[in-house]
Amino acid sequence: MATSVETAALLSKKALMRPVGSKNANEIGADFEKMIEEGLNKINIGPGGLTGTKSVMGVNVEQAARHPSCLAVGVSTGCWGHRRATIRINADMSYEMISHKGMTL
């Protein structure tokens, strides 16, 4: 949430890249994230739309200063597995997928 669509889009991407399970540094922002996450999970869409109690893994919100007369909101969605991975590359160019065990490149 920000004062311009450009800033809102940038903050939306920043929120998307935060680690799963992280909380907003601002207490009000953290409470807002929790409220949205609980609400989304109550509708019981579930993983892949197949019903269940966990519809989202988390909700991340970033905010910037804004004027009361305008509010821009940017929303980004994405699967955590498609945007984050940890790999260890050794001197002999062998590798180990730390975050996605068993996956090969």
Language-model regions, residue ranges each:
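Non-transmembrane, aqueous-exposed alpha-helical and coiled segments at domain scale
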Residues: 1-105
